[in-house]
Amino acid sequence: MSKEQLKKYGTTFHFASQFLSAKHIESAANLYAICRQIDDIADTSDDKEQAKHDLLVLKQALIDEDASHPIVEAAKSIEPAICLETLVELTDGVLSDTGSVRLHSEPELMRYCYQVAGTVGLLMCDLFEITNPIARHHAVDLGVAMQLTNICRDVLEDAENGRVYLPETLIGPMSASEVAGATGANADRIRDVVNYLLTEADVRYESGVSGLCFLPTQPRLAILVAALSYREIGMIVADRGFDIWAGRAFTSKTQKLLIAFKGVMTFFFSRRLHVYQGAHDSSLHRGLLRRPGVHWA
């Protein structure tokens, strides 16, 4: 993946990557390209049955470590090596996006967030050669936090495409069209749930940041800036009163510069970014079952 493609398709990642070394940028960009290709199978195909078939073929190729599949070949060429089992989990998560989506429960939502984003945290650990189980638990939390932010930002866009990630147990039996056009009590309920999920994301951002001390110095700063950037999107949604119908939340260039400044200041003056000061909360992984990087207690 070229730097221009990275800038176009992964703006937050491109911004944070400015704090990485050239070696880490190349590896991370190649990993991003693989994740993007997997995601695009579900998102860009008009034939959802064909997309599902292609993802199932990819999943089996990953399980078999069959390098004749171009995505598996690309994954196996990344150095340091990444875990193909983690990519299987990612592919399973993307498979659930082939068609309409209606999540029933909060544990189901958290499993989805783990599969499509917690796995990315684990793959980044692979790139930085982080094997400490505690560090990897925190990496899962950061990925889940970012995905919860994405979901809260994109409620309207997803609903217009037949996807509702807000759990039925929280918002009630609303259809995608009812979410997109919600008014009155239904709109209030959606705002309350978005507020709740962003609060859950904040807990996981805190956990994710507390695990950054396990990373090498340069990646530590880069991932901190990425975390602050995503978290800022949630703050923008909150500042709008959790009005998900008010347009897509994004950070301006000025906000990005302020985030970078905050990241650098935090990096230099926050002890927890350099010394591990706590223990991982296994309750954050409740319902994720026995999967790579999950804190099973």
Where are these regions (language model features)?
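Catalytic cores of Mg2+-dependent Asp-rich isoprenoid enzymes
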Residues: 1-146, 152, 157-297
